[in-house]
Structure formats: C-alpha cells, structure tokens
C-alpha cells in the first residue's frame, strides 16, 4: 500500500499546474491539493491557460497520479437569506467542477455552507437544493463535503449533519467526504484518545467508504472549541502521535492525505512552508521538537 501524502500547493503565474507539481515534488510529496484560482474571488484563467499538459506530464514523471481540488470559500450554497449568493455559489461550483475534471482530478473539496443565521435546518435544506442543481448523473467528479469545526453558522460540524445532506441529494453517488482532523477535533470529537471510536461512529452514520480525502492538521485550540485554527503537526492540541496514527490507519490506507498547516516564521513577509519537513516527519514516524526552527532556517 502506498502512503499518499502531500499538501496544499499554489497554482499561479505562467506555470500553473506544472508549478504546482514542481512545488509538491520539492516537498517530497506524491499527491497535492490546489485551488484553481484565488479562493476569495471568482477570477479564473480559462482552462486552456492552466498548463495542464505540461503539469500532467511532470506529475507522471514523478509518480503523482492523484490530485485534489479545493472549491473556493466564497461559495456558500447554505445561504437562504440572499438568493444572489446562493446562485453565485451554484453557478461557480458548476464551473469549478469543469475545471477539476480538466485538471484530471476526481475530487473537489467543498465546505458545505453556512446558514448565516437562518438555522441549521434551513441551511441544510438549501445545501441539498444547491447540490441537486449542480450534480447530474453523468459527471466523473465527486464533491467531497468537508467535516467542519462549527465556527459561526457553519453546517456540517457533526456527522449527522453531513449524513442529512448526503441523504437529501438525488445523485449522492457523486458525494464523498473530506475528513479534516482539526475540524473534527474542534467540533468536539475525541480523535486524540479514541480515533477508532470516532471512525466507527462515522462509519455507522455516513459510511467510512465515503471518505476520499483527509486533511491532516493539528489544532491551536482544545477539543470542542469550534474555532478552526490549524497548527503545525505535533505542535497543537491533537499532537503528533494521534495524527501519525490517523495517517497510517489501516482503514484509510489508500486515501490522499493533505496537509494544510500554517507557514512558519515571525516575519509576516517571509514565512516558510513547513510541508517538506512535516511530510518527512510523518513518513519517518518520529516527532522533532526543533522542527519549527529548522523550517525557518531553510
């Protein structure tokens, strides 16, 4: 079994997908995740400018056969208050799915949505409506609903909420789940001392076979804080031992694991990516106390 381990990488400039693949390889990764453009706006390059052919060739040369796309966080199909926001979310999600397919990825990770004060039931109802508009039966891409921390009015912070969304969608064979360790911890699940119990609960409520992506992040906050602030691997409230256990869990073996941990350094203009060091540490199974200093010194 191959451990598919990588991180979020950038996709910009002239190189686009080729640059993403080169960045991933520089970290010692064999998978990666990208946004197809800035996550906070709808400006996107046309598909023919994503440099897909060169990017795919570089991936193939370096043994990367699986990549993930993350939908931008401006998409909110849980908004029942503003029809324009909902419509933008549906339309933009549809075009992002086309871009995901063009890149050769089969998973696009989506934050389910926020109810913006209308209540969870209303939010879930709207998310189902949006997904039913977007998902037709003939498309190869799955939308991976991300487990959320429960910050603000986020929907999808419990397994039950995600199950309700999945069960409400007609073509729900096109839905999968992205299990985020920081989010589930912050939502109150005890993944530190009882990950097997949490996974069993997930299996009963949703089905473990739905998990197609894992976001591996430590957390700056104690369990149940509903905050969603990622921390570097081993330096937060989840800790290295628990995260290493999750990454190497026999039930999650072939699933891509993606790090979204923060860049390191005091100088805001010159923070350094931690991924090469964290990937190496996870593969070797030994925690390095002095890792952050090492990252800054690179």
Swiss-Prot record:
Pfam families the UniProt entry points to: AP_endonuc_2
PROSITE patterns reported in the protein's UniProt record: AP_NUCLEASE_F2_1, AP_NUCLEASE_F2_2, AP_NUCLEASE_F2_3, AP_NUCLEASE_F2_4
Coiled-coil annotated spans: none
Biological processes annotated in GO: base-excision repair
InterPro entries given in the database record: AP_endonuc_2 (IPR001719), AP_endonuc_F2_Zn_BS (IPR018246), Xyl_isomerase-like_sf (IPR036237), Xyl_isomerase-like_TIM-brl (IPR013022)
Cofactor note: Binds 3 Zn(2+) ions.
Major enzyme class: hydrolase
Enzymatic reactions: Endonucleolytic cleavage to 5'-phosphooligonucleotide end-products
GO MF term (any one): deoxyribonuclease IV (phage-T4-induced) activity
UniProt entry tagged with the keyword DNA damage: yes
Alphabetical UniProt keywords: DNA damage, DNA repair, Endonuclease, Hydrolase, Metal-binding, Nuclease, Zinc
Protein task: Endonuclease IV plays a role in DNA repair. It cleaves phosphodiester bonds at apurinic or apyrimidinic (AP) sites, generating a 3'-hydroxyl group and a 5'-terminal sugar phosphate.
Family indicated by similarity: Belongs to the AP endonuclease 2 family.
Name of this chain's protein: Probable endonuclease 4
Biological classification of the source: Bacteria, Bacillati, Bacillota, Bacilli, Bacillales
Name of the gene: nfo
